[in-house]
Design a protein with these regions (language model features):
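Short, Lys/Arg-rich, polar N-terminal cytosolic tail immediately upstream
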Residues: 2-32
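Membrane-interface helix/loop caps of multi-pass membrane proteins
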Residues: 20-358
């Protein structure tokens, strides 16, 4: 980690902020929920299938939007709990993010660079170098914005195409803790209104740009932060406002769970890449993810599907699985343009093996 010589009186990394006590212990976001781990699987599996067999799940790309909601909910929960207990540290927060993200990413980039030497043409390999640099700096979304659309045929020759979403998440990790520090002394109601207003503004921006400048809307962080913000709003309302669906009947929570699953699965099954995305259609799976998380672990699909052991297993390796599956497929598309379904399935199976090992 980078050491600093800034005097403690000038700025303290663990300086206590004016805290807000959570409403009740029961209303705080749970530190670990198997159903959210299973929700990661529901997010990543359609992405994998869409990349290998796009006709099977034409809207599988919505899985990334579900990931954004999960990340917003979980990361903001960590920050909110830390600030509420006067124990939040920027250094500790970023250290944990680095330990979780960087080792696997470095291993992946090393593999991509080595394999690309044998598979790519010289000009393609030179371009790959720029993508590796951009991925290392977490600005791959901007690199792709200057080059290519996500759904174009040429995108199949970009082994690091998928890292646009990781870049947006890391940009969020950099910005959000600082925003929390700046606004924390405001009242609860003002913060709630501010979060909601930001969601509406950024969501409206995404909806407008998705029809006029699709690539900009797809890759630009401000047109994606509202999806993370949906998870943030739920986390904040649980932690500090006291919102919890536990006060509702079991049937209501079951209904929220079922509705959430349908709002995720149906767009994945029927919406195609020609839709204006991210836009109004994206609101459906985003709200679906919010409903599932809000429904709590004992809701119907949460306990039966998302807590199912195979789903939680996939959820636990979802980050590695997402990292590794696309470079394997991309190099396969380049080296074997007419790869059979069995070969594509083998590539996906290999990504599972690697994800389970790294």
């Amino acid at each position: 980690m980078i050491k600093t010589n800034i005097a403690p009186r000038a700025y303290a990394l663990k300086r206590p902020l004016k805290t807000m006590t959570p409403m009740t212990a029961a209303s705080r976001p749970k530190l670990w929920r198997n159903d959210i781990t299973g929700l990661r699987a529901l997010a990543v599996l359609p992405v994998l299938i869409f990349h290998a067999f796009p006709s099977l799940i034409p809207g599988g790309f919505f899985g990334v939007d579900v990931f954004f909601v999960i990340s917003g909910y979980l990361i903001s929960g960590i920050i909110f709990r830390g600030i509420a207990s006067s124990s939040f540290s920027y250094l500790e927060f970023y250290e944990k993010r680095i330990k979780r993200i960087i080792p696997n990413l470095i291993l992946l980039l090393t593999f991509v660079a080595a394999a690309g030497w044998f598979i790519l043409l010289p000009d393609e390999y030179a371009n790959l170098g720029m993508h590796i640099d951009a991925s290392t700096l977490f600005i791959q979304n901007f690199q792709l914005l200057s080059e290519i659309g996500y759904f174009t045929e040429d995108a199949l020759r970009k082994p690091l195409l998928h890292l646009w979403s990781l870049a947006i998440e890391e940009q969020f990790y950099i910005v959000f803790p600082l925003i929390c520090t700046l606004i924390w002394r405001l009242s609860r109601s003002v913060k709630m209104i501010g979060i909601a207003a930001a969601l509406i503004a950024l969501g409206s921006l995404a909806a407008c740009l998705s029809s006029s400048d699709r690539n900009f809307a797809f890759y630009f962080p401000l047109t994606r932060f509202w999806e993370l913000g949906a998870g943030i709003l739920l986390s904040y309302s649980e932690t500090f406002i006291g919102f919890s669906t536990s006060r509702f009947s079991q049937n209501v929570r079951n209904g929220l769970s079922i509705a959430g699953i349908l709002m995720i699965v149906l767009p994945m099954a029927f919406v195609t890449e020609s839709a204006a995305h991210p836009g109004l259609i994206t609101l459906i799976p985003v709200l679906g993810a919010v409903l599932i998380i809000a429904a709590e672990p004992d809701a119907f699909f949460n306990r039966t599907l998302l807590c199912w052991r195979p789903m939680t297993f996939v959820g636990l390796i979802s980050y590695s699985l997402y990292l590794w599956h696309w470079p394997l497929l991309a190099y396969l598309f380049i080296a074997v343009p007419d790869a059979t379904p069995s070969v594509l399935i083998a590539a996906l199976a290999l990504s599972f093996v690697i994800a389970a090992l790294v």
